[in-house]
Amino acid sequence: MTHSSQDTGSCGIQEDGKLYVVDSINDLNKLNLCPAGSQHLFPLEDKIPVLGTNSGNGSRSLFFVGLLIVLIVSLALVFFVIFLIVQTGNKMDDVSRRLTAEGKDIDDLKRINNMIVKRLNQLNQLDSEQN
């Protein structure tokens, strides 16, 4: 037989309700058997279980503290990654500017090389004509 998690949760609430009823009946019996003022009875508010509280509050708060720490560390890592992306973008801009400048330098060197080759060809033609 399988029970869903809701069935087990509702079963726990029913058991709490049964315990509350039994405590209430015991309190009524004590009132009927004991004279007034001879026994200090706890107010009913102390015996009514509050749905939001249980004995696992310590583990629940520990869970939330751990979750908070994980979120803070994650946020720090995200900011670090964003910082690295910005720095990498700046470095890429620098490299791009250098390559553009070097490309212009290379074009200038090619132009100078062509001028030298033309001059050498002219000199070779002059030498061949003189011979």
Curated annotation (Swiss-Prot):
It comes from Homo sapiens. This is Leucine-rich single-pass membrane protein 1. The chain crosses the membrane at residues 65-85. It is found in: Membrane. InterPro entries: DUF4577 (IPR028099). Keywords: Coiled coil, Membrane, Phosphoprotein, Transmembrane, Transmembrane helix. The modification Phosphoserine is found at S24. The keyword Transmembrane helix applies. The keyword Nucleotide-binding does not apply. It comes from the Eukaryota. It is a single-pass membrane protein. GO terms for cellular component: membrane. Residues 90-125 form a coiled coil.
